[in-house]
């Protein structure tokens, strides 16, 4: 299996799917989006068509097109493009996995099906194995997010012996606040053979202390630069500085959570900070209110998080 020599590590932006005001995918801005992540945020890995990308609100055809555009625009700019291929049925997941391999993606990830749910570890692994087999040469990651799937199988239980059953398994995106479960995953990963990517942005420093090898999150789209500074401080064993960065990031996330924070609000914040129009979410999600956007902007300013191109004196400039 021709897996990349460099493991997936560091920050991975869970990308937004840009849309027009009438709900169609806005493909022309994806190239600009890639450049913004790399040049302004220092983020060179992406996770496409996940929760933040509204992957499960897109048609299979749209998911294929979105994946193709990110791979095309990211060529020679991004380090790794991981495509989420999870779906509610096996055949669609297999189709998307095979397509990801055909277009040159660097890896695939799969969420647990959440209508008809796996009742135990063996059933879930059987599903994951069949998806992975559709693209055996691609690194395979399990996307663990029990708060949305309702699948309560612990990640540390799943990891036990998984590579014997799924040879392409390379790690997991752990989007849960259960640090005991995550710590046990790290404890199993003695030889660091797996990428253990933490997915709760406001708890990242805690996960780094436990041994996270990287992170996948929505805030790295617009707070990647600040989070990278936290990673650098942590690597240099400057815990005081790392804590300072984490607390500032937490202040913002805590504030917007209290206002009501999700995919819709992430789109509004990314539009505000980057100047790239992300558009509204797709129904049933509702567009973020102007009040939310104004409050989020004020908080970003108070934390000095708005010093990015595309903004001038706090006001968004038109983007070409």
Curated annotation (Swiss-Prot):
Catalytic activity: aceneuramate = aldehydo-N-acetyl-D-mannosamine + pyruvate
Keyword Lyase attributed: yes
Active site: residue positions: 143, 173
Pathway the protein takes part in: Amino-sugar metabolism; N-acetylneuraminate degradation
EC number(s) reported in the record: 4.1.3.3
GO biological process, one term: N-acetylneuraminate catabolic process
Record GO terms (molecular function): identical protein binding; N-acetylneuraminate lyase activity
Keywords: Carbohydrate metabolism, Cytoplasm, Lyase, Schiff base
InterPro entries named in the record: Aldolase_TIM (IPR013785), DapA-like (IPR002220)
Record localization: Cytoplasm
Predominant location category: cytoplasm
Pfam families: DHDPS (PF00701)
Subunit structure: Homotetramer.
Recorded family membership: Belongs to the DapA family. NanA subfamily.
Free-text function comment from the UniProt entry: Catalyzes the cleavage of N-acetylneuraminic acid (sialic acid) to form pyruvate and N-acetylmannosamine via a Schiff base intermediate. It prevents sialic acids from being recycled and returning to the cell surface. Involved in the N-glycolylneuraminic acid (Neu5Gc) degradation pathway.
Protein name listed in UniProt: N-acetylneuraminate lyase
Organism: Rattus norvegicus (Rat)
Name of the coding gene: Npl
């Amino acid at each position: 299996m021709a897996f990349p020599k460099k493991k997936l590590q560091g920050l991975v932006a869970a990308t937004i799917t840009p849309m027009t005001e009438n709900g169609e995918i806005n493909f022309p801005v994806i190239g600009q989006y890639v450049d913004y992540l790399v040049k302004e945020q220092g983020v060179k890995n992406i996770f496409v068509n996940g929760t933040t990308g509204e992957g499960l609100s897109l048609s299979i055809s749209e998911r294929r097109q979105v994946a193709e555009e990110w791979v095309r625009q990211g060529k020679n700019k991004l380090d790794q493009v991981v495509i989420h291929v999870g779906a509610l049925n096996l055949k669609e997941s297999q189709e998307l996995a095979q397509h990801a391999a055909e277009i040159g993606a660097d890896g695939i990830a799969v969420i647990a099906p959440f209508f008809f749910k796996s009742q135990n570890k063996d059933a879930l692994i059987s599903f994951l194995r069949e998806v992975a087999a559709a693209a055996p040469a691609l690194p395979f990651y399990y996307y663990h997010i029990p708060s949305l799937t309702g699948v309560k199988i612990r990640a540390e239980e799943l990891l036990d012996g998984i590579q014997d059953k799924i040879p392409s398994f390379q790690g997991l995106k752990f989007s849960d606040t259960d640090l005991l479960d995550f710590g046990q995953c790290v404890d199993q990963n003695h030889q660091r053979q797996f990428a253990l990517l933490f997915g709760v942005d406001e708890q990242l420093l805690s996960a780094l202390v436990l041994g996270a090898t990287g992170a996948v999150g929505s805030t790295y789209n617009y707070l990647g630069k600040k989070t990278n500074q936290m990673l650098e401080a942590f690597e240099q064993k400057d815990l005081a500085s790392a804590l300072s960065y984490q607390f500032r990031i937490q202040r913002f996330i805590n504030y917007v959570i209290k206002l009501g924070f999700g995919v819709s609000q992430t789109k509004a914040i990314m539009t505000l900070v980057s100047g790239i129009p992300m558009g509204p979410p797709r129904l049933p999600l509702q567009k973020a209110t102007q009040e939310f956007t104004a409050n989020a902007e004020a908080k970003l300013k108070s934390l000095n998080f708005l010093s990015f191109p595309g903004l001038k004196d706090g006001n968004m400039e038109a983007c070409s």
